[in-house]
Amino acid sequence: MNAFDKVIGYKATKRELLQLCDMLRNREIYEEMGARLPHGLLLYGDPGLGKTLLARCFVEESGLHTITVRRDKGSDAFIDGITQAFASAKTKAPSIVLLDDMDKFANEDDTHCDAPEYAAVQAGIDDVKDTGVFVIATANDIRKLPSSLRRSGRFDRKIGLQAPTASDAEEIITHYLKTKQVSDSVNMEDLTRMMRYNSCAELETILNEAAVRAAFARKTGIDMEDMVSVVLKQQYGAQEDMPRVSDEVIEKVALHEAGHLVVCEALCPGSVGFASLLPSDENRCGGFIHCCKGASDSQSAIIALGGKAAVETRYAGQVAEGCSDDIACAVNCIREAAAKEGTLGFSLLNVESDSSSDMSESLNARSEAAVQAELERYYGKARALLAQNEVFLKEITEALVMKKTLLYSDIQAIRGTAVKKNPAVTCEAASRYDAAEIENFPPEDPEEAMRQKIMRKLEEAERRRCS
């Protein structure tokens, strides 16, 4: 049992911190090996990830006298406090100086890197070097710190904290639920797959809000309805009630979201954590899905066009409304892949120097033509996937209209039933589907036809540019 056991997750980080604590407690062993204690430890990462908690556990595990410095005074008094903290730690060595939220020590103006607060910290670190004083600092954004402060020699060991992984999140949720009354209806897999893992603090807040909701309703325990409602509200800004709209509008929204979901599941099976028709901060028109597994840029582009493809396939001759964000997302995915990875060939890579911020006119014309061609191709793939998964699409749409929100277990149950009726296809199978029927590609070699189409688009764009 050690002080770090109270921190859930971060196994690799805790091992590294335990090693440093062992060095502080048993310097002679390491010195005999010719190893010296690193100069300083800097923990950094987004707010709420547990940097301060880990630093406090480090202090507790080390057992050394510790002086904590955080910005709680005016500038002059604070600078004096920094100097006094290092001087006091030096007289009580071996000891620790903890600089909490060090990136907030100075104002965030253009000259904050040269602020006297950071100069005082640097002077203090240099003054206690090799005196038995160990310095720990936490920061949200180390880019706000002077490079001279965060360099090796002042902070030899830098540890960046990331948002919890899926397994970390499940461990954190399980830990916090131990202190709460929980109904048997809570499905841990559904819960972890629908949540975003932004920080440990956010996960704790969500579980507490679920407990508040259950207590207010005078329930005997937190149930899945409480969990889902709080996650949708806290993480997605979703309203609890559907807006008053016609059945036809609800059905179209459901079909649109089902299109995204089915394409996503076909390309990346088991990737959709949940789907909902409720309006959210990100989509005030209503409807969104959460993918709990990462997709490639090309897959993301196809998924983004799935909603439009579903509606326009069902309502032939109609152009789906409210798809501008989806199209913009698909375009961005195509451009990212083309610019960074050369997915459309080297001719579309911007190889100009970084000092030139504007893309050349010729390159821009070629890029726009290629993006348009790729949009058509990916739209065709989305329609092909939906045609192959017609039963799955129909049943997801009906379930969304009825339940408004589908969890991971709901989606997989529907998928399992649909597969028995009409086996769902994978991305590879979709590429063999008769895209010729949609895009007039020769069925024997659709990829070559696509390349020829892109070349014709590029030639047409070049002719327009030169005319």
Predicted features along the sequence, with ranges:
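Terminal C-lobe "cap" of eukaryotic-type protein kinase domains
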Residues: 230-234
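Soluble catalytic regions of large protease machineries
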Residues: 46, 250-254, 261-467
